Amino acid sequence: MKKILFLCLLVSVLSWSCSESKRKINESVVDFEQDSLAGNAALPKVTFYQYEDSSNFPDAILELYTPLGNQVFRPGKVPFEFNIKNFSYFGEVSQNPKLFLIFNGGDRIGFFSPIFQRELTEGTYRVAAYLVDEDGYSLKSFGNYIDRDFMVGESRAFPYSAEPYIALNLPTNEQTLLLGEELIIDFLVLGGDMKLDELKVQIAVNDFKYEVDHMAPVRVANLPLGEYKVNVKLMRTDGKELEGPFSAVVKTVYIR
C-alpha cells in the first residue's frame, strides 16, 4: 500500500514539474462584448496566452531545389524536391507528416517524403514550406522554413514586393474543436524579421482581439460554443497595414 501511495505521489510531482517547465507569458483575459454572453458570470473568461520560447530543432535546415524561383511548369504534376539537414526526426516512422506546404495562403498540406509531385492547375503560386515538431507546430528558427514563387501554364509572376507576409500553420479552415479544447494559432512570418522590421501580428477571433510581437503559438482558452472567424494579420507596429496579398489570413473554426 505504501508503495502504491509513493508511486502516486511521484507521478503527481512529475506531472507538476512538467507543467511548471512551461511558463505562460503575454496572458490576456478578454471580457465578453456580446450581450448574450456578457451577463453570464458562470462562463469562464476567454484567455489568450503563449508559452515561453523553447525553440525545437534550431539547427534543422530545409532546402528547396525544385522549383526554382519563377520557374514555369506545364499544368499537371509539378515536381518538388527538398533537402532536409540536421533533422533526424524526419526519418522516424510516424503517422504524422513532418514537412508541410502552404500554397497561396491556403491550408497546410503534409508530406512524408522530401521528393514528390503535386497536381496544379494554371496560375501563379507562392509556396511556403516548413518543418514541424512532434506536436505539429511549425519550427521557427532561421533555416527551418523556406518560400518560393513559381508559375504553372500561361501565367505572370507576382509583382515584385519586398514586404514580409504570413503563413498560417494552425488552425486549418473549418477546423472543429470540442468545447474546452484550446484553439491554437501557429504562424510563420516570411520575408522579414518581426523585431528588426518592427512588425506585429494582430489576431481577432470574432470580437476577441490579441497582439503579439514574436513568432510563437498563441493559445486561446475558454471559447464558448459557436462559429468563429479567426483573422490573423501581419502589420507594422505603428498600425500601418501591409499591402501584400498574403499579409492576412482568415479561417473559420467551430467549437462544438
Which residues fall in each region the model found?
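C-terminal motif of bacterial Sec signal peptides marking the signal peptidase cleavage site
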Residues: 14-17
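Bacterial signal peptide processing site
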Residues: 19-21
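Short, compositionally biased P/S/T/A/G/V-rich stretches that sit at domain boundaries
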Residues: 26-72, 153-176
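Short coil/turn motif common to extracellular beta-sandwich-like domains
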Residues: 73-80, 85, 177-186
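Short beta-strand segments within Ig-like beta-sandwich modules, predominantly Fibronectin type-III
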Residues: 105-113, 207-215
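Surface-exposed, short loops/turns at beta-strand junctions within beta-sandwich domains
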Residues: 118-124, 220-229
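Short acidic/polar inter-strand loop motif in beta-rich domains
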Residues: 132-141, 210, 235-243
